[in-house]
């Protein structure tokens, strides 16, 4: 077999096609043609050619070497159409190059010339839109015009190569006839439904030549090789590109750019920096040098007469700072753990760069939070601004992830138009659910765990992504990223949030090829999920679980902060494709705030009616909890926090007790308000956190469920109590009221009105038959709820 990388660039390529490089006037490549020749031969290529953009100068540099031929990557256009297209043209002469330059503005003229002159050629990266103008109509005409297409491109995302092959392999004579009639354009070649695939690395940085290539039967000469390609006796081999490979090439080009432009200004320290950068690119400690290497640096300094420049404060500071950081035992141990089993230099480099940058970013963020708490706004902004240089250092990675990400929505449109169907890789089959909370005692965590478990049982691909230091949940698919650090929320100190490893999460989402990001919380993980979706062009759903602005108002008593919270919520949920809310009230609320009605969906909720069941009533449950058996048992289940309006419950309970009615209040849950509420309710019983069977027994063994919260958007505890046969008392503000039919299966009271809550408690406490009747109807109202059914409705809402 014979091999040749039929798509590769040298330092003779014109201005870079990458926006990041054009923005800073970086060259497309620094790889010298003769160096490239040696690399390709070392990597098993039998023939060598260079496909620089619209030039053959690089080929002329190696024309005297064996097994070479002249090629180029031609930029061309359809007439009066700004869409850029690239053709790979191989085995040409200087005279033919001149003809190609003259004809390249019109793809029809260019194709005719190439065919007439029997010049081997192929459409490069057919599904990659070079300047954002590519449409299905362009692809349809390319199919009619050309026989050869690049089947594996080693630079662009592997999904694009896979989809290109799928699209072109599925052509039929009938489809070709349809395209010819649509565009009034006859195919230029025989059997146009049978395409030939070529492969090339499209390497620009000199790091990944021959990562993809074209293979033919054994060829004695370059012309024999190209004859095999022309007749279709060839296959595309190798692998598609990744963001890490692209960014690795970027860093290499950047290093060469700095060496080229600034070596004289850097003096002898340039050698040191070059060596450090070389180690960095190999994923090794950039400060760890052998005795021999150190001696070489000193010798070079002596020979140049600039030995003392190496001792300048700036150079010493750089060396000392980096050496000190990498010498720390904790850093060494963490670095060793991260690198264990990782062989690819680009991944080792990525892990090292992220570890250092993320730790620095968290220190600056901690400073920001400290200054905010101290009321030092200017100082806090200064601390936050320090993150900007870190973003600049990581910009090649950030750019690579985004530029490599295929536009799934655009590709779906192309396939719909051209085939009438969406191929499996573009269907919404694998989703990541981002959350800041999973172990906490709240409805958000409960919903995520129940819904995910139902998804697993249904055989769907759903993974929860979070970032917690200590995570004990293991009954559902979870990817937990150890946080860089944690911080407390002001005014809500018991709620700790994580500072997640953002770039590692982005890399994971890209590698796992998720099709949709589900965002459950507006915290750091929710923002990370949104960033990943935007960077990788993924479909998004957001779930508005919690009325955050109302929480902020209650906790801070500050209307300005409440308005800021609303602005943030509006921005966050405005970014996603679909917003799930928990009730019709909140759906109307978001419509009033300008959201399109079709964007807003009600989140289906399930319930385990076998677990939460009146048959679990246990008369022996309460004596152990301090009951005397003759009292009417009032039950609250939920987080013990101020925003749950528990002060209203406390006041109402006191009013009822003052009338002499035999009632006893039991509270299940934990939270930051526990101590204060216990002091306000010395005769109530606090049971702490309960779950599973004990919680089900608590529900079923109570008589009335009281939930005065005005901030909940739904209320899982409401339907759990109803399933247990309890009448429920709720307020007329928030989502829970939509779960209760007033005076049928419960009572709806005025929000923040302790007097009205007391009246409702009194009514039910005095009338056992009313309690029983309402409890029976409450149970019937939720019997049709199940988690499998809720999951199916949720999952298929955003299906393609």
Where are these regions (language model features)?
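Carbohydrate-associated surface elements
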Residues: 468, 585, 606
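Conserved donor-binding/catalytic core segment of Leloir-type glycosyltransferases
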Residues: 433, 627-644, 650-654
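Short alpha-helical donor nucleotide-sugar binding micro-motif in glycosyltransferases
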Residues: 690, 697-702
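Aromatic "clamp/platform" in nucleotide-sugar-dependent glycosyltransferases that forms part
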Residues: 710
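Conserved acidic donor-binding segment of nucleotide-sugar-dependent glycosyltransferases
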Residues: 742-743, 747-754, 763-769
């Amino acid at each position: 077999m014979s091999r040749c990388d039929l798509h590769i660039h040298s330092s003779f390529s014109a201005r870079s096609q990458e926006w990041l490089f054009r923005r800073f006037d970086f060259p497309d490549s620094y790889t010298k043609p003769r160096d490239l020749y040696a690399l390709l031969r070392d990597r098993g290529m039998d023939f060598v050619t260079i496909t620089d953009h619209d030039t053959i100068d690089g080929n002329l540099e190696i024309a005297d070497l064996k097994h070479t031929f002249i090629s180029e990557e031609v930029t061309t256009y359809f007439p009066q159409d700004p869409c850029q297209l690239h053709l790979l043209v191989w085995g040409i002469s200087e005279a033919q190059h001149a003809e190609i330059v003259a004809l390249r503005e019109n793809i029809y003229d260019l194709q005719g010339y190439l065919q007439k002159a029997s010049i081997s050629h192929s459409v490069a990266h057919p599904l990659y839109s070079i300047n954002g103008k590519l449409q299905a109509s362009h692809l349809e005409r390319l199919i009619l015009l050309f026989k050869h297409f690049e089947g594996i491109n080693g630079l662009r995302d592997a999904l694009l190569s896979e989809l290109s092959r799928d699209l072109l392999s599925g052509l039929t004579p009938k489809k070709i006839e349809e395209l010819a009639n649509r565009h009034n354009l006859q195919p230029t070649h025989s059997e146009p439904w049978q395409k030939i695939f070529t492969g090339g690395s499209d390497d620009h940085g000199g790091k990944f030549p021959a990562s993809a290539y074209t293979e033919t039967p054994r060829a004695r000469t370059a012309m024999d090789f190209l004859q095999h390609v022309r007749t279709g006796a060839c296959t595309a081999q190798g692998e598609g590109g990744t963001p890490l490979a692209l960014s690795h090439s970027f860093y290499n080009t950047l290093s060469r750019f700095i060496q080229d432009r600034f070596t004289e200004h850097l003096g002898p320290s340039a050698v040191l920096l070059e060596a450090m950068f070389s180690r960095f690119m190999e994923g090794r400690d950039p400060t760890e040098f052998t005795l021999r290497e150190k001696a070489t640096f000193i010798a070079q300094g002596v020979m140049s007469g600039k030995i003392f420049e190496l001792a300048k404060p700036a150079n010493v500071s750089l060396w000392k700072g980096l050496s000190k950081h990498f010498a720390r035992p904790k850093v060494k141990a963490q670095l060793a753990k991260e690198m264990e089993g990782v062989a690819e230099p680009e991944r080792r480099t990525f892990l090292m760069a992220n570890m250092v940058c993320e730790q620095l970013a968290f220190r600056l963020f901690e400073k920001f939070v400290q200054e905010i708490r101290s009321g030092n706004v200017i100082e806090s902004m200064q601390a936050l601004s320090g993150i900007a240089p870190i973003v600049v250092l990581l910009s090649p990675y950030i750019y690579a992830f985004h530029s490599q990400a295929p536009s799934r929505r655009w590709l779906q449109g192309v396939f719909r138009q051209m085939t009438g169907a969406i191929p499996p890789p573009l269907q919404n089959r694998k989703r990541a659910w981002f959350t800041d909370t999973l172990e906490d005692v709240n409805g958000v965590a409960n919903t995520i765990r129940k819904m995910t478990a139902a998804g697993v049982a249904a055989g769907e691909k759903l993974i929860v992504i979070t970032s917690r230091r200590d995570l004990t949940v293991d009954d559902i698919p979870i990817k937990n990223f150890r946080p860089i650090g944690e911080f407390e929320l002001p005014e809500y100190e018991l709620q700790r949030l994580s500072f997640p490893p953002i770039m590692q999460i982005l890399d994971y989402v890209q590698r796992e090829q998720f099709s949709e990001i589900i965002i459950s919380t507006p915290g750091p993980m929710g923002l990370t999920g949104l960033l990943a979706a935007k960077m990788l062009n993924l479909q998004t759903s957001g779930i508005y679980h919690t009325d955050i602005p109302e929480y902020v108002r209650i906790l801070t008593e500050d209307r300005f902060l409440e308005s800021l919270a609303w602005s943030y919520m509006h921005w966050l949920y405005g970014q996603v494709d679909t917003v799930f809310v928990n009730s019709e009230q909140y759906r109307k609320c978001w419509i009033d705030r300008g959201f399109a009605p079709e964007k807003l969906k009600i989140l289906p909720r399930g319930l385990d009616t076998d677990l939460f069941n009146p048959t679990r009533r246990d008369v022996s449950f309460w004596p152990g909890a301090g009951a005397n058996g003759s009292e009417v048992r009032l039950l609250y289940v939920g987080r013990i926090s101020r925003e749950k309006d528990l002060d209203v419950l406390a006041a109402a309970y006191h009013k009822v007790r003052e009338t002499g009615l035999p009632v006893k209040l039991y509270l299940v849950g934990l939270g930051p308000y526990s101590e204060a509420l216990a002091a306000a309710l010395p005769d109530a019983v606090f049971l702490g956190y309960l779950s599973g069977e004990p919680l089900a027994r608590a529900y079923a063994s109570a008589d009335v469920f009281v939930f005065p919260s005005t901030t909940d958007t739904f209320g899982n505890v409401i339907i759990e109590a109803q399933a247990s046969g309890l009448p429920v008392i709720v307020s007329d503000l928030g989502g829970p009221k939509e779960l209760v039919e007033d005076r049928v299966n419960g009572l709806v009271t005025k929000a923040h009105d302790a007097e009205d809550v007391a009246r409702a408690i009194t009514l039910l406490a005095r009338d056992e038959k009313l309690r029983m009747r309402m409890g029976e109807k409450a149970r019937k109202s939720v019997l049709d709820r199940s988690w499998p059914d809720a999951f199916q409705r949720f999952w298929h809402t955003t299906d393609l």
